[in-house]
Amino acid sequence: MMRSLYSGVSGLQNHQTRMDVVGNNIANVNTIGFKKGRVNFQDMISQSISVASRPTDARGGTNPKQVGLGMNVASIDTIHTQGAFQSTQKASDLGVSGNGFFILKEGKNLFYTRAGAFDVDSDRHLVNPANGMRIQGWMARDLEGEKVINTASDIEDLIIPIGDKEGAKSTKNVTFACNLDKRLPLIQEGASPADIARGTWVVNKSLYDSFGNVSVLELRVVKDLNTPNLWNATVLINGEQNSNFTLGFDNEGALASLNGQPGQKGDILQIPITFNVLGANVGEVGEQQTVNLKLGTVGSYTDSITQFADSSSTKAIIQDGYGMGYMENYEIDQNGVIVGIYSNGIRRDLGKIALASFMNPGGLAKSGDTNFVETSNSGQVRIGETGLAGLGDIRSGVLEMANVDLAEQFTDMIVTQRGFQANAKTITTSDQLLQELVRLKN
């Protein structure tokens, strides 16, 4: 009879544990990155009254007689299903769409989390502002004048250098991929200024030297009076004539020749121009600068000047220089690349956020602050970039909500409550039976 008392006690204790887990799930229903827990029960050892016997010629076999001695908690699992995303419109708020974890560092210790409410501290580190832990990834490094992110190197603290300067870069090339309207009228001798304006295609482009001084390129193009599909171009720098050249097109509107020299299909037609850069002071003449005008590829319509009966365009004209600028803002793309946005219009890759994965994420241990730590049963951490081995993508401007389903938790709460009540009834009923035994003495 005493066994039923202890079975009831084990039921009370373990249903209380289950209620604790359910209560914690409900408490964290609005905790970003939280992963719900689940309690599984199993029965305890059973006491054997008699063992099983095998069949004989005279009798059949018998089954064992066993009395269970209660139950205990088999496991308390952490369920790592994807939570829904909540939009925040804040660039440093991040969520993972996939199985990866953000990596945080405190001293020499690494922690892993799905809670991506990050910010930039006074030292310009990307951190979790709740505890100061630093987000890990890879910073871009200078390689032959270009910023390169080496994801094969060790992870490090990520720095977002708000306010840093980006030096000026001199213009080396001006690339044209615009259209000259074949319908433009010819400019006859003695034409009026209005007729000249109607028959001239004009484009202006700012050019930069290594100090950020600006010179203005003006290109004026008119139809040749005598030769079909031929255009005469004049280059002006800062209002002064610099050079002249001619452009020829085939009968299908594609670029064909430069200065009367026909090119082979696929040839790039370009012409250098040299000029004196305007200095910073009025009247000051700077050093000479040479800029290459890339007019296009012979026979190409996509990356060349063309001649079609459509409006002349100036949109597809690009120069590769810029003045000095300051980093004003940043954004993070779905690959985890942190892109700096500068006041001079330049965008620079600053670094990349690393993600971690585990063979058995259920083996991770919760360490507080919605963080996890590696254990002997989680498997060793595997660190990589987004998109690899199921790590998933990074979403900027969102936070992952808890994966707690309140309807499920309330149902589990009711079942747990009834289980607790039933075990309590087992104890009170066993107590009544003991009282009957005591009364037999009287």
Predicted regions and their residues:
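Conserved functional loop/turn residues at catalytic and ligand-binding sites
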Residues: 30, 398, 441
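N-terminal intrinsically disordered, low-complexity, charge/repeat-rich segments that act as generic
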Residues: 1-39, 43
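Short segments within alpha-helical structural elements
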Residues: 426, 430-434
